[in-house]
Amino acid sequence: MAGSIVFVTDNQISANSRHKPRFRRRRGACESCKRRKVRCNGTNPCNQCQKSSIECLYSSSSWKANDGDTERGPSGSPVQHTRGSLTPPQTSPYGGMACNGSAEESSRFDGSDAHSLLMSLSNTDCTTNTEATEMSQWQNWFVSDLPLGSDVQLTGTSDESLTDWLDPQLVNPADTAAIMQTLSGEDLFKSSGPSYGMSEPPSRDSDPGFNTARNEQIAGFIQKLRSQRPFVLRDENPEAPPGNIRGFYDAKFISQCFDACDADPEGVRVLLERKSMDLIADEITKYALAVDTETSVLFHSLMAIGCHSLNLDQGHRAIGKGKYPASKFFKEALNARQHLRDSPSLGGLQAILTMAYFSARVGDDSTSSFLADAAFCVQTLQLHNAGAIEQKYNSFLEQQVAKRALWFLYSLEKPRCLAQGLLPLIHDDFVDYDPPPSANYSTSEVDWFAINARFARICSSIIKERLGCKLGRTPSRRGKDRASEYSASSVIKRLESLLEEWRDDLPFAGDFDATRSDEFAASTCAERRHRIKCLNKYWSAIIATHSGQARGVAEDGGAGVRLSRARCIDAAQAILQNSHYVTSTDILSDISLYYYITVATRVIMTVVIRDRFASDITGDPVQKNTATRKRETTHGRSIMSYVGIAIGLFSRLSLDIDVPVDEVTELGKLGR
């Protein structure tokens, strides 16, 4: 027998029914799930292995998988499939979104917590103009600009992807030299022989330091670290969602959820006034389904945000046992999404932005399509600048609402485009005016709306410079002179000065030099989470600023290249230093904290592996054993200690959420 047989009831039938319950037979858990100690649905491949993109292994193949179950993920939600190719979407003249499925099809999820969205919301067959054209535009630029030859295959995004510096861009994966050259950020062959370009790789037999299988394995590990989203590990006995969701529409619970929305100083409270939210609550409690579509979508989105925050309150619930139906509320909002696109309005724009904020907060891939919907509404309403807004709306209050909505969209889009390497939709000319005060601004409080708007401006400047190819070249480009390096260094200096000014104006700017555990211990969970987010936001922007020049070739002194690499390493170390105080609940509350950690981990792992491979090529056993371990950092630790910090962090997080701990561990082993 291949394993224990588990009988699973398809439908719950009352005891007085004459019909017997139907059972279907499933095999036991696969070996991968047993080793990882996660719940397996017994299919081949199972839901956990599909989600984690690992091989699904069973002790025997005598049984055949149930074809009806292989396409199902946790909580009965369809598993997201990776698109094999990109097809041109049917976009509007405004560069909006083409949606090939209904809102109902895109919202089939039954999970009791908001993190089922990570699997189910992404099944919407929608693509933005940015997402659909990003690959082809970057590839065309990359091929035309570099003398790579006609046989080069591009299987990833552009070489100039904004946060993928030093990661292995799979350019002609069979070419081991090309993979390692891109991974290291420098020409590793220079010290051991003649210089080779990416289109002219050396023979694999000539250099025993390169192993094709090993290099492709490294590329897979880093790709997994870059792409995997953290999922909640389901409890064996999860709480069942409430059967009657109407019980959550009473005024007391609505007020509790809205209070949870207000708790985030950078959340929807900067977009919506509390009195407006209370008016929406009154309409819902009095008229229920008689309210207009914009009000209904906005209300259900706010309730989803509030339930999500309440479920993650460490004082009430355990991770994976959500009491409040965040997903059901958001499903109600999704059902009317198409109407908001068909009939754009200022209220509809606010509703879409609220949905986009929630999607970005839980880390769903549909965030880009929500932002595209918002950009489509902005274009349709012709909110192109301050003059257009003032001409369209006579009331000063409406003008402020429109300007605030456009700045909120700008503040959401620019950092995301910088992080994901996307092409932005909102031009800077759309916000040719200073951001208005926060919707709930008080002179006794910090206006985080203005702070985030300022940071978005800096992100936009970094994106412009990167898109203009002014921040460095790839290792294969030849003939860089000192003038180009000087120009890149001057641009970097200007951008970093803007970041430093932004950092110094933060309320807790003095905590950037060192992380003091006593201050984190004395603060609340929300304060600690917010402070760490601001710290890591600054350091990740430093990495993005220096990453282009860090990939350059350290020739003719290469002072600028070495400085950029050192700054990237320092920033990654600072992020990992702060990770001591990041919990699984923090990550599930705001997915950006996980993104900062993965960026820092990729930087540290790549530096360590680059040094290890450089030692292999030179054939110096002394350098191989001591070079990496003895490299001291600005924090007084060897860089290998930060590899240990990363492995320990992912191991700790893996107790509650599904993170690529095995891949991080293997990368650490390769760097030793």
UniProtKB/Swiss-Prot annotation:
Residues 77-93 have a biased composition (Polar residues). One of its GO terms (biological process) is positive regulation of fumonisin biosynthetic process. Keywords: DNA-binding, Metal-binding, Nucleus, Transcription, Transcription regulation. Its main location: nucleus. Pfam families: Zn_clus (PF00172). It is found in: Nucleus. Disruption phenotype: Impairs the production of fumonisins. Abolishes expression of FUM8 and FUM19 but expression of FUM17 and FUM18 can still be induced. Residues 30-56 bind DNA. Induction: Expression is controlled by the global regulators for secondary metabolite VE1 and LAE1. Expression is increased under histone deacetylase (HDAC)-inhibiting conditions. GO terms for cellular component: nucleus. One of its GO terms (molecular function) is zinc ion binding. Signal peptide: none annotated. PROSITE patterns: ZN2_CY6_FUNGAL_1, ZN2_CY6_FUNGAL_2. InterPro entries: AtrR-like, Zn2-C6_fun-type_DNA-bd_sf, Zn2Cys6_DnaBD. Residues 65-111, 190-212 are annotated as: Disordered. Transcription factor that regulates the expression of the gene cluster that mediates the biosynthesis of fumonisins B1 (FB1), B2 (FB2), B3 (FB3), and B4 (FB4), which are carcinogenic mycotoxins. PANTHER family: HALOTOLERANCE PROTEIN 9-RELATED, TRANSCRIPTION FACTOR PDR1. This is Fumonisin cluster-specific transcription factor FUM21. The gene is FUM21.
